[in-house]
Amino acid sequence: MVHWLADKGKLKLDENVANIWPEFGVNGKDQIKVNHILNHTSGLHNALAGVTEDPKLFCDWDECLKRIAMAAPETEPGRQLIYHYLSYGWLCGGIIEHVSGKKFQDILEESIVRPLNVEGELYIGIPPGVESRLATLAIDADDPSRLAPKAHPGIPSSLTLTSISNLIALLNILDGRRAIVPGGNGHFSARALARYYATLVDGGVIPPRHPSSSLPSLGSHPHHPMNKKDENQNQNQNKEDTTDEVETTIFVNPKAKIHDAFLGTGDYKNLTLPNGVFGLGFSRCRTAGGSLFGFGHAGLGGSTAYCDINNRFAIAVTLNKLCEGALTGEIIRFICSQLDLPVPLKYVGST
């Protein structure tokens, strides 16, 4: 969504966040730029670290934005890449709202949900009536400790087994599912998430509708089930549209420039740490030999999605029984072997 706004000329990726979000420019954050946040180098990796212990705060979007605007960085911006875990979503969310003048969820609908026709299958904070279609998150009971993050300089100190357990509990309660937590409670079907990456792999060109054999048809679920007007509009949108008003792309700039922005390459190479795990908003996919071939992002407990730029391939794996990712690796290796595609280094030989 930040890239969508940048593509429209609403912000620059090397712009100071405080120019966009004045309240943010305090406590040593006046030199933090948008690219520092997208590259996980802003120093705010532990901001709001105790939020999973405070359900009321966790579910209060506006209060979380206020508090993160007051946070102080722990490292100099642009110097050290440390994964921003939950703080990333509030940081990007604040930028999105201040740049656009609109609410986060309105931009989500405008930039992704409606153009891609994934109504009812892609949410960050669910509306009333969707909860009956959601899976319950569970930890692999065989060895829950395997979910604990491995010690690594790029992992924040606040990301612990306790914080993960607290987060899972919050995401299984209704208030937690209705909250806007972009860094933690995206609710997606695998096909909606794969469609999103299929759009990105082609530089924003929206793929054709899914075949009729894919049931229920994509976009057929009521997006706001308790809103009858919305449900009727959703049904009308799913009828074959032959007008010239149908969107064909979500970006204006050429595909190569869009991909460079995602990966932090080309004109954007100075906005990221060299050879870092992350580009600008996405993790970089490399082969075992080190060749860069795509981008994506893994989620908690094995869920993941990525795309292969060279082969125009996108995949999403969504799990509700959370484990350390061995099953995900098996799925990805099998599919890549069948299609003769490179396997991301993260999943090469994972067990």
Protein language model regions, located:
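Active-site-proximal loop and beta-strand segments within enzyme catalytic domains
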Residues: M1-L86, G94
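Residues at or immediately flanking beta-strands
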Residues: N16, E121-Y123
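Catalytic loop of the DD-peptidase/beta-lactamase superfamily, centered on the K-T-G motif
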Residues: Q80, Y85, E97-P115, Y123, ...
